[in-house]
Amino acid sequence: MRNTSKELHGAASRYAPCDWYYHLPVKQSEKAVDAPPASQIPGLSDPREAPSGHTLGLRRYWVKETDSEYVKLAKQGGRPDLLKHFAPGTTKGSPVAYSLPDWYIHHSKPPTADQRQVPAVSIPDYMVYEEFNPDQATGNFESRMGPFDFDMKTIWQREAEELEKEKKKVRLPAIKSKYPSKVGTPLGHREPAGSKLSFPPIPGQRPSSPTNFSKLISNGYKDEWLQQQADSDKRAPQTPQSSVSSPSPLDAELPADPEAPGDTTEAAESSPLSSAAPPPDSTPVELK
């Protein structure tokens, strides 16, 4: 015969207990169990019971000295009826419409549909044409001005007003002196002859002639200008011998410029004059 008691005992001990994984009561108890509060903030959990056995009237025990003013006000319930709106009349009966507060409108009772005025639609003044009627005009009449152009006069009216202004200008007579011989003409009207500078025109220059770039790149205009300067120096009248001074030793030491042909011609022309001039009485002192 088989021992059934041993098999049942072995089957029951084959699985490990699951007490560490979950707690499942064998039978639902009918006794009421106190659940933890939904929130730790006083007043947000079950308001029927106060913490530490105090009643709702003794909420001063919740406020601590270390709390801020905002926390103290929140623990005491805040301002009464802060977010409530009380409609006029009784709350019992048919529901009433939402009434506007007194501070939002000027009168306590809103106007009915018959009392409401229809807003008048008006057009801007510059879009309305109204003929001027002198019979209805008063002293305070002002013509309507446009949105941009404020000049209501015609060109003929403007010209007539300008002519009247010119005529109204006071013109003083010229002051005539009793002694015209002693009074000289002012220098402001006529400039003296010495103050005006006049430059001779450059010979051979044509303002209308186009620029030759090949001549410009090859320094052709430079050579032409140097030749014109040499020709103008040759045509200039020669100064007398008395006005020509002997060359200084510094001028003799300076080398001649090979690019300036006008300097060579001037040196050639001044050489016979300088040789004919008598030698100076005293030699100049050499510069240190």
Curated annotation (Swiss-Prot):
Residues 221-236 have a biased composition (Basic and acidic residues). It comes from the Eukaryota. Coiled coil: none annotated. Residues 237-249, 267-276 have a biased composition (Low complexity). It holds the Pfam family DUF5524. Residues 206-217 have a biased composition (Polar residues). Residues 31-52, 179-288 are annotated as: Disordered. This is Uncharacterized protein C7orf57 homolog. It comes from Bos taurus (Bovine). The lineage of its organism: Eukaryota, Metazoa, Chordata, Craniata, Vertebrata.
